[in-house]
Curated annotation (Swiss-Prot):
Modified residues (Phosphothreonine): T649, T665
Localisation per UniProt entry: Nucleus; Cytoplasm, Perinuclear region; Cell junction
GO cellular component, one term: perinuclear region of cytoplasm
Source lineage: Eukaryota, Metazoa, Chordata, Craniata, Vertebrata
Role played: Transcriptional corepressor. Corepressor of MTG8 transcriptional repression. Recruits NR2E1 to repress transcription. Has some intrinsic repression activity. Promotes vascular smooth cell (VSMC) migration and orientation.
PTM annotation: Phosphorylated in vitro by MAPK8/JNK1 on Ser-735.
Positions with biased composition (Low complexity): 258-270, 349-365, 375-396, 484-503, 565-582, 618-628
Superkingdom classification of source: Eukaryota
Keyword Transcription: yes
Name of the protein this chain belongs to: Atrophin-1
Motif (Nuclear localization signal): 16-32
Originating species: Pan troglodytes
Keyword Transcription: yes
Length: 1186
């Protein structure tokens, strides 16, 4: 989608840049017209929305979008006399539009935005969307409309800017060329009355709207958003519209916050734009919209919004213009003014332009829609979609059609959604729908196309549009007019009716919609206004909008407005508002009720609007359609939209238009409508019933396909189609290409069997009149008994069987898992029990370790492993080391249950920082005493120069006490029952080895569950002493100290330096070898950041005894093996390091040993090879001081 968008964007850009691109131009024109009108609408809406948005979004996205928009907006605005508006709009526009433009520009895809910003883009967007299609020279307007609308849809899809596109129209400047084209359109004015109308409307709106408008328009055009804005501004509604578009976009921005709004308005544009942030410019909203339906938004959806805008704009200009002038002018103008507060005056002018548009308004239908859109837009602007939606309403039909359809595909919602959907889409939960929409959007585009076509084509195809068409000009105008009022209503109802409107594009539908639409629209405007109002004081808006509706809308919108502001705003007010406002706005309960629905309503509005717009568009589009060729195609497209929809979702689509709507509304509508929206949407649906549109609601999904259809439509649209491809982008779906969207009469849902073959019966779902040739409105059902049926049945059966099988397997797995869990729970319970026991006893460690491995033999190293549950595997030195370091103390196992945990604690809480009971002294007092004694000793020792007394030495060792476990861990294994090898690694997981060893060593006594606490303590103490003795052995000591290999390693690596320093130190101090008296010498422990004094090891508070020595020897031997045993737990690196450290230490010790050897204790003298020496030496070191 994005790509397409980009492409389109580019195209658009191109278009913008190029006057030439007929389609583009056309689109542009159309877009412009649309944008002009719509743009204005957009702009106005934008202004309005802008304002609101600006306010809201302003804050949100104001910055960027603001800048962009502002620039553009200002450009336009200023240009236009919308200065006021401009600022606001700027804001608004800024928000959505500028960004859009800029972004768009920036982003190809975002072009949309740009479009919004820039006319070209806008148009381009249209183009983009509908570009191919767009270009229908004759159809320019149509095309433009269609294209624009479509394009807008698509383009818009791309860019909310299309929303802005109307703005883009402003880009008139660029688009101006298109404008030229457009102008031609204007020329075309006669041409299709909507062409002219549109152009006039649009254009007029844009340029015609009065010089200012033109300026504004131009500016708007140039500014695009602004243009829109300004025209909008002038339109008042225009601003709103702009806002609508922009507002949609812009509002979106406000919605940005409320994504909804964004979604809605922006959604249409910005939200959609979000992707097109540019549009978001308004993509602020975009962003939000994205949030809302970023997916959607990013997707085409936004464009649709844009598109709708465009469409709406395009149409709306006429539409808007007319109603505006007629009905709207005041109200709308007001509304618009309201929409663009500043626009008020501007609105006046704009209005004037509107009137200009009005003239086009002849095309009026479009113009009014446009105007309306403006109004709507303005109000709706939020409905950029609104514009679209509103516009849609007014333009809603448009937008719906156009926008919606346009967007439909992407953002059908944007279109209508824009107003209606969009919010839903964005704002709404509908969003999802919308998202679907996103997919759906394509359909919407189709619809949009439809609408657009309707809008654009409507002229030519008004009839095509059927009701839409029917509503057509008069209706359109009326619609718009009504729409405005009604749009409000419509919006409210619209939602329901939207479809209706859509569906019932027929005047009745349309009309009603228009009425409703008008109401709704008005609501939109109001909504928008509200939105805007919300954003900015829109209250006047309401007044100004059709007071009644205005109020309604307003009130709805108003109330909602603010909320809607974002929402409503975004969408149409109603829609958006609908959304929030929606609720109120869409008087429709459903809409109101379902939040999503509100969007739906919005959508509905769109729908209604669409309808209306469509009607209007159709009407107006009639004018527009004048550019019938594309028009029709567009319409066809539009119709196809339904078709597309239908195709996409045959049933859904059926409505075709509705699908479009659906698309447009899908989120709101379809998603909402159909689902939630059913009520709302449903109404729409029914509405849909009236026309393809209604189905749109249902077709929401289908609408998706329409996008493809849209593309298909695109072709039909011809030039428009081309741009329509973006719709295709939206194609997402259901793929019925909405090729013949244009002038074909609105598809009628027939559902009659058309052909039967041996194996299947084909049902014709939609009857598209003379345009049904290539439509894929058929769906076939395999006949029973046929091979196909059989195959399908088999497949189903197979799937069912597989599912059952899977379910069975799953159940078994579940059972297995349950059993597993049970087992684990059992283990845990056991563990807890053992832990409790352990805690009662030697809670600190042994028991815990036991606990962990209650099922294992007491000493089994495994227990340690269990203790260190996450056994990482054989060797994860780095991990282990890391985790070790992460521990409070390297030496101690992290978990309290750990056998060594206490050991660490045992070492000395102070030392280790563990407050665990000492290994041998659980009694805190005892521990305390001991520690004090040790510290005293140490101090004394240190004073004399590290004279370490063996006892002290041992105490230091004590550190190893826990370490001793470690040591044992290494060497102790032998001692232990557990196999040394076993313990090391098993324990080692992290502190495992040392724990294991400790377990094993200490385990002997300590771990053994059978031992009493006292025994265990005694044993442990012995063990500790033993170890400590061993500990004298530097190696052992090292090992012990480094309870864990890595710790050890760490010490080494970490402190080989320390070692050496220690050597120096202890050498200097003639004191203790680091190993021996780690503390004294700044031993490893010291190295390990233990407080020196705290090292005293509780275990060896007293000198070792012979038995300890013996033990020690026992240990010693294992200790010798230590490297091996250590190695198990250690990684190669660890081992190496440990070995290296050891060897270094050993060598140094050996040298030093000699001095101390004589001093060594016998026990230290235990015959150990090097170790013995080492160890003797260590001991000696200790003793030496003695």
């Amino acid at each position: 989608m994005k790509t397409r968008q980009n492409k389109d964007s580019m195209s658009m850009r191109s278009g913008r840049k190029k006057e030439a691109p007929g389609p583009r131009e056309e689109l542009r024109s159309r877009g412009r017209a649309s944008p002009g009108g719509v743009s204005t609408s957009s702009s106005d809406g934008k202004a309005e929305k802008s304002r609101q948005t600006a306010k809201k979004a302003r804050v949100e996205e104001a910055s960027t979008p603001k800048v962009n928009k502002q620039g553009r907006s200002e450009e336009i605005s200023e240009s236009e006399s919308e200065e006021t508006n401009a600022p606001k709009k700027t804001k608004t526009e800024e928000l959505p539009r500028p960004q859009s433009p800029s972004d768009l520009d920036s982003l190809d895809g975002r072009s949309l935005n740009d479009d919004g910003s820039s006319d070209p883009r806008d148009i381009d967007q249209d183009n983009r969307s509908t570009s191919p299609s767009i270009y229908s020279p004759g159809s320019v307007e149509n095309d433009s409309d269609s294209s624009s609308g479509l394009s807008q849809g698509p383009a818009r899809p791309y860019h909310p800017p299309p929303l802005f596109p109307p703005s883009p129209q402003p880009p008139d400047s660029t688009p101006r060329q298109p404008e030229a084209s457009f102008e031609p359109h204007p020329s075309v004015t006669p041409t299709g009355y909507h062409a002219p109308m549109e152009p006039p409307t649009s254009r007029m709106f844009q340029a015609p709207p009065g010089a200012p408008p033109p300026h504004p328009q131009l500016y708007p055009g140039g500014t695009g958003g602004v243009l829109s804005g300004p025209p909008m501004g002038p339109k008042g509604g225009g601003a709103a519209s702009s806002v609508g578009g922009p507002n949609g976009g812009k509002q979106h921005p406000p919605p940005t916050t409320p994504i909804s709004v964004s979604s809605s308005g922006a959604s249409g544009a910005p939200p959609t734009k979000p992707p097109t942030t540019p549009v978001g410019g308004g993509n602020l909203p975009s962003a939000p919209p994205p949030a809302n339906f970023p997916h959607v938004t990013p997707n085409l959806p936004p464009p649709p919004a844009l598109r709708p805008l465009n469409n709406a704009s395009a149409s709306p200009p006429g539409l808007g213009a007319q109603p505006l002038p007629g009905h709207l002018p005041s109200p709308h103008a007001m509304g618009q003014g309201m929409g663009g507060l500043p626009p008020g005056p501007e609105k006046g002018p704009t209005l004037a332009p509107s009137p200009h548009s009005l003239p086009p308004a002849s095309s009026s239908a479009p113009a009014p829609p446009m105007r309306f859109p403006y109004s709507s837009s303005s109000s709706s602007s939020a409905a950029a979609s609104s514009s679209s939606s509103s516009s849609s309403s007014s333009a809603s039909p448009f937008p719906a059609s156009q926008a919606l359809p346009s967007y439909p595909h992407s953002f059908p919602p944007p279109t209508s959604l824009s107003v209606s959907n969009q919010p839903p889409k964005y704002t709404q939960p509908s969003l999802p729908s919308q998202a679907v929409w996103s997919q759906g959007p394509p359909p919407p585009p189709p619809y949009g196309r439809l609408l657009a076509n309707s809008n654009a084509h409507p002229g030519p195809f008004p009839p095509s549009t059927g009701a839409q068409s029917t509503a057509h000009p008069p209706v359109s105008t009326h619609h718009h007019h009504h729409q405005q009022q009604q749009q409000q209503q419509q919006q409210q109802q619209q939602q329901q009716q939207q479809h209706h409107g859509n569906s019932g594009p027929p005047p009745p539908g349309a009309f009603p919609h228009p009425l409703e639409g008008g109401s709704s629209h008005h609501a939109h405007p109001y909504a928008m206004s509200p939105s805007l109002g919300s954003l900015r004081p829109y209250p006047p808006g309401p007044a100004h909008l059709p007071p009644p509706h205005s109020q309604v809308s307003y009130s709805q919108a108003g109330p909602n407005g603010p909320p809607v502001s974002s929402s409503s705003n975004s969408s149409s007010s109603t829609s958006q508002g609908s959304y929030p406002c929606s609720h109120p706005s869409p008087s429709q309960g459903p809409q109101g009720a379902p939040y999503p629905f509100p969007p739906v309503p919005t959508v509905t509005t769109s729908s209604a609007t669409l309808s209306t717009v469509i009607a209007t568009v159709a009407s107006s589009p009639a004018g527009y359609k004048t550019a019938s060729p594309p028009g029709p195609p567009p319409y066809g497209k539009r119709a196809p939209s339904p078709g597309a929809y239908k195709t996409a979702t045959p049933p859904g689509y059926k409505p075709g238009s509705p699908p479009s709507f659906r698309t447009g509304t899908p989120p709101g509508y379809r998603g909402t409508s159909p689902p939630a929206g059913p009520g709302t949407f449903k109404p729409g649906s029914p509405t849909v019933g009236p026309g393809p549109l209604p189905p749109a609601g249902p077709s929401g999904l289908p609408s998706l396909p329409p996008p493809p259809a849209a593309p298909a439509s695109g072709p039909p649209l011809s030039a428009t189609q081309i741009k329509q491809e973006p719709a295709e982008e939206y194609e997402t779906p259901e793929s019925p290409v909405p090729p013949a969207r244009s002038p074909s009469p609105p598809p009628k849902v027939v559902d009659v069997p058309s052909h039967a073959s041996q194996s299947a019966r084909f049902n014709k779902h939609l009857d598209r009149g003379f345009n049904s040739c290539a439509r894929s409105d058929l769906y076939f059902v395999p006949l029973e008994g046929s091979k196909l049926a059989k195959k399908r049945a088999d497949l189903v059966e197979k799937v069912r069987r597989e599912a059952e099988q899977r379910a069975r397997e799953e159940k078994e797995r579940e059972r297995e898992r349950e059993r597993e869990k049970e087992r684990e729970r059992e283990k845990e319970r056991e563990l807890e029990r053992s832990v409790k026991l352990a805690q009662e006893g030697r809670a600190p460690v042994e028991c815990p370790s036991l606990g962990p491995v209650p099922h294992r033999p007491p000493f089994e190293p495994g227990s340690a492993v269990a203790t260190v549950p996450p056994y990482l595997g054989p060797d994860t030195p780095a991990l282990r080391t890391l985790s070790e370091y992460a521990r409070p103390h390297v030496m101690s196992p992290g978990n309290r249950n750990h056998p060594f945990y206490v050991p660490l604690g045992a070492v000395d809480p102070g030392l280790l920082g563990y407050n665990v009971p000492a290994l041998y002294s659980s009694d805190p007092a005892a521990r305390e005493r001991e520690r004090e004694a040790r510290e005293r000793d140490l101090r004394d020792r240190l004073k004399p120069g590290f004279e370490v007394k063996p006892s002290e030495l041992e105490p230091l060792h004590g550190v190893p006490g826990p370490g001793l476990d470690p040591f044992p861990r290494h060497g102790g294994l032998a001692l232990q029952p557990g196999p040394p090898g076993l313990h090391p690694f098993p324990f080692h997981p992290s502190l495992g080895p040392l724990e294991r060893e400790r377990l094993a060593l200490a385990a002997g006594p300590a771990l053994r569950p059978d031992m009493s606490y006292a025994e265990r303590l005694a044993a442990e103490r012995q063990h500790a002493e033993r170890v400590a003795a061993l500990g004298n052995d530097p190696l052992a000591r090292l090992q012990m100290l480094n309870v864990t290999p890595h710790h050890h390693q760490h010490s080494h690596i970490h402190s080989h330096l320390h070692l050496h320093q220690q050597d120096a130190i202890h050498a200097a101090s003639a004191s203790v070898h680091p190993l021996i008296d780690p503390l004294a010498s700044g031993s490893h422990l010291t190295r390990i950041p233990y407080p020196a004094g705290t090292l005293p090891n509780p275990l060896l508070p007293h000198p070792l005894h012979e038995n300890e020595v013996l033990r020690h020897q026992l240990f010693a031997a294992p200790y010798r093996d230590l490297p091996a045993s250590l190695s198990a737990p250690m990684s190669a690196a660890h081992q190496l390091q440990a070995m290296h450290a050891q060897s270094a230490e050993l060598q140094r010790l050996a040298l030093e040993q000699q001095q101390w050897l004589h001093a060594h204790h016998p026990l230290h003298s235990v015959p150990l090879p090097a170790q013995e020496d080492y160890y003797s030496h260590l001991k000696k070191e200790s003793d030496k001081p003695l």
